Amino acid sequence: MPRSNYLFTSESVSEGHPDKVCDRISDTVVDAYLAAMPEARLGVETLATTNRIVIAGEVRGPDSVTFKDLEALTREAVKDIGYEQSGFHWKNNDVAIHLHAQSADIAQGVDAAGNKDEGAGDQGIMFGYAADETPELMPAPIFYAHKILKDLADARKARQGDAAKLGPDAKSQVTVRYENGRPVEVTQIVLSTQHLDESLDSADVRAIVEPYILKALPQGWVNEGTVWHVNPTGKFVIGGPDGDAGLTGRKIIVDTYGGAAPHGGGAFSGKDPTKVDRSAAYAARYLAKNVVAAGLASRATIQLAYAIGVSKPLSIYVDLHGTGTVDEAKLEAVLMDAMDLSPRGIRTALSLNKPIYARTSAYGHFGRAPEADGGFSWERTDLAGKLKSALA
């Protein structure tokens, strides 16, 4: 019997968090190659530390994308995030790029040839999840943890009042109380943010961020019993990769469902959409969201499994957490028929061979609005009617 009354906590980190800086750079490289050649293959890792950025990995793409281009794009990404401090400045950082050709052994298993369809780029398991806790069909704790930081970043970049005193590096954490299985209030708020004005103390920072936090959360969720922890260690001036080294792919729970659903372990950023770590996780979210949007369940978890060089998923698993109106085994069969879940099928259905990934690198890959150019296409609910009809 699932619990109905409990507390659940999720965290998010801002675009200026060291690991997110690296995710942004890796996905900027992915976008550069996909813009030049939609079938490009990439596995790109980034390390960022004091005054230094290192980009390494494997690429199969056009020579028209030069290292000089990538260095300029990297500096522009860091500038957009907002780093102009002595230990990490977009203009002065040393940028080293070490990209080489994709392994021929991997390519022969992944490439389509003759009657062989394009295979998965690796083995692995991927999960998708949806819940009717927010209009975006996301778990409430992670959705609002993201929203707090996104709103603060937007205000900082727009230099709105005292928000201009904040720095790019920040973390949030939201504890939500559930009653009868529904989110009803926030019991704890944690917000740590870099500040450029060294004279600010915790109370000063709270005065800046509190209005944005209150606006980001549903009305009535914050009350006199809510406990606030704003910059609980005091001063937070040295931030970003100058304070802690960053790496691509270290915030996989922040990127997904904040711990409310299982995770297969594969990161997203730096990978082209032939990599099922990314594309199949997007497909699983797309299916789960459409199941909930169709009214077939209040919560849905979907697992997909792949083997390198094999085009079709090895298995699909559906868990509706006791909230479903349909048989889960029957739904599994319907989902397999509703969408081609081969790597090529996913990329085609969701139009993934586009430069749409840098924007995913912060504030979550899920729960975002589908965009006109194909960004966040996996958040569409255009499959809901088909699923509902198939199970009527």
Swiss-Prot record:
- Record-linked PROSITE patterns: ADOMET_SYNTHASE_1, ADOMET_SYNTHASE_2
Cellular component per GO? cytoplasm
Q: Which cofactor does it need?
A: Mg(2+); K(+)
Q: Which residues bind ATP?
A: 17, 169-171, 235-236, 244, 250-251, 267, 271
Which GO molecular function terms does the record list?
A: ATP binding; magnesium ion binding; methionine adenosyltransferase activity
Q: Where in the cell is it found?
A: Cytoplasm
Q: Which UniProt keywords apply?
A: ATP-binding, Cytoplasm, Magnesium, Metal-binding, Nucleotide-binding, One-carbon metabolism, Potassium, Transferase
Top-level EC class: transferase
**Gene3D superfamilies named in the record:** 3.30.300.10
Residue positions binding L-methionine? 58, 102, 244, 275
Read off the CDD domains from this record.
Answer: S-AdoMet_synt (cd18079)
Q: In which pathway does it act?
A: Amino-acid biosynthesis; S-adenosyl-L-methionine biosynthesis; S-adenosyl-L-methionine from L-methionine: step 1/1
Mind telling me which SUPFAM superfamilies this protein's record contains? S-adenosylmethionine synthetase (SSF55973)
Indicate which residues the UniProt annotation says bind Mg(2+). Answer: 19
Record region (Flexible loop): 102-112
Q: Which residues bind K(+)?
A: 45
NCBIfam families named among the record's database cross-references: metK
- What protein family is recorded? Belongs to the AdoMet synthase family.
Q: What is this protein called?
A: S-adenosylmethionine synthase
